[in-house]
C-alpha cells in the first residue's frame, strides 16, 4: 500500500471512530470507578476507562457494518459505502475491539464479565435489530451508558464500609440511561426522512417530530432529576462542586434543546445537528461531575477541560463532513428539510 493509500485508510478508520464522541464513554466508566470509593489503583482506573472505550469503538465499527446498505443510499460519503473501508475490515475491527473488552473484563472478574456481556449484547442488539424499532431502540442504546458506569464501579468494587454508594450509583445509572436515550432520540430526529425511506420505524417516523421533541424533554427532565438525587445522596463535602457542575450541564442542555422546541413542527437538519453537537459536549461535563463527586474537583477539572476541548475541536474539524458529506453543509443551510445523517452516538 502506498503512503497516500495508508493515509486514506487511516482517515477512514478515524472517521468511523467518531473522535468527537470517543472521550465520553471512558469518562463514564471512570466516573463509575470513582463512585465506588474503593482502592483507586491506577491500573484499575485505566481499565475502567479502556474497556468501555473499546466496546464503544467496536459498536461504531459493527454499527456501520450493519447499516452499510442503508448508508449506501443516504450517506454514501461514509467510509464503508464510499469504498474507503471494506465491510469485512469493519467487521473484523469491531470483533477485535470486543476482544479487548472481553480480555479486560475477564481480568476484572465475574462482575465485569457480566457487565461486558450485557454491553456487548446491547451493542449488537441495537445495531442489528432494535435501531429501527421506535423507542425500544433508543432505550437499548441509552442503557449502554448506564452499563459503562456500572462496569467502572465493578472494576474497582463497592466498599462494604460505604453502603451509601449503592443508591448514588443507582441514581447515576438512571441519569445516564435517560440522558443517552434522549441524545440518541435527538439523533433519530436528524434522520426522519432517511429512516422512513429505509424502512426504519423510529419514534420520529412513527409519531412525528413534535411528539419526539416532547419525549426528549421528558427524558432530559428525568436525567436532571436523577442526577440531582445522586448529588443529594452523596458525600456532603463534595456536593457543592457537583451541584455547580450540574448547573453548567443544565445550562448547556437548555442551549441544545431550546432550538428543537422552536423548530419542532419542521426540523431543519442543522438545528438537530447543532443540538446533538452541544449535547455531545454537555454529556462530557455531566460525566465529569460524577468523577468530581468521587475523586474531587482537582481530578475532575484535570480530565474535563482537555476532554471538552478535544470534543469541541474534533466536532469542528470532522463532524459536518462525516454527517453531511463534502459540500453538503451549504446545501443544508439553504433547505428546511432534513438530510440523512443519523449515527449511533
Predicted regions and their residues:
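Multi-pass alpha-helical membrane architecture of UbiA-family
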Residues: 1-345
